[in-house]
């Protein structure tokens, strides 16, 4: 299990009962905090260069990409642009669908759902369902969610 490597060698802040599937790419692990009972699906990219905070009982499907920093296509050196730089926060019990991209300076509210393939460029309100590129609200989710994940999935890292 590689979780101790992330936690103790790379100084990634990981709470208990977190499940991380295979082939996850981590950028600046010391800038990432993952809450209790969160599941990170396979082939995820987690970018902690500008800070990434993931709440409790968050479900990441496969192939989720979170970018806290972007290069400037106009810069002759392809340098990172301070205008395209900022932390991402995913609040408790959010559900991130497969092949989703979440860009810098975004907060995904508690209980929010991001549909498969969405490109999230702006904050997502709590208990809303968003989809598309760029993501827009397409529904709402009931409040009062009680589910908790307790780890132990057979394919964890």
Positions of the model-derived regions?
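Short, small-residue-biased leader/transition segments that mark boundaries at the very start
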Residues: 1-3
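Conserved catalytic segment of ABC-fold P-loop ATPases
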Residues: 109-112, 125-127
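Flexible, glycine/small-residue-enriched loop-and-beta-strand segment within the central core
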Residues: 24-34, 39-107, 133-134, 139-149
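Conserved G/P- and acidic residue-centered "switch" motifs that form tight phosphate/ATP-binding loops
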Residues: 114, 132
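Intrinsically disordered, low-complexity acidic/proline-/asparagine-rich linker or regulatory tail/stalk regions
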Residues: 149-157
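Short, contiguous, helix-prone interaction/anchoring segments in small proteins
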Residues: 9-15, 26-29
């Amino acid at each position: 299990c590689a979780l101790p490597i992330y936690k103790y060698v790379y100084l990634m802040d990981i709470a208990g009962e977190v499940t991380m599937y295979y082939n996850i790419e981590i950028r600046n692990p010391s800038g990432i905090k993952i809450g209790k009972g969160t599941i990170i699906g396979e082939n995820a990219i987690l970018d902690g260069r500008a800070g990434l905070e993931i709440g409790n009982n968050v479900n990441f499907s496969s192939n989720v990409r979170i970018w806290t920093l972007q290069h400037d296509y106009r810069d002759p050196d392809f340098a990172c642009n301070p205008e395209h730089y900022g932390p991402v926060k995913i609040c408790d019990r959010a559900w991130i669908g497969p092949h989703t991209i979440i860009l810098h300076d975004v907060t995904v509210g508690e209980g929010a759902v991001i549909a498969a393939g969405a490109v999230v460029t702006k904050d997502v309100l709590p208990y809303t369902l968003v989809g598309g590129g760029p993501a827009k609200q397409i529904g709402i989710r009931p409040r009062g969610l009680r589910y908790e994940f307790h780890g132990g999935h057979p394919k964890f890292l």
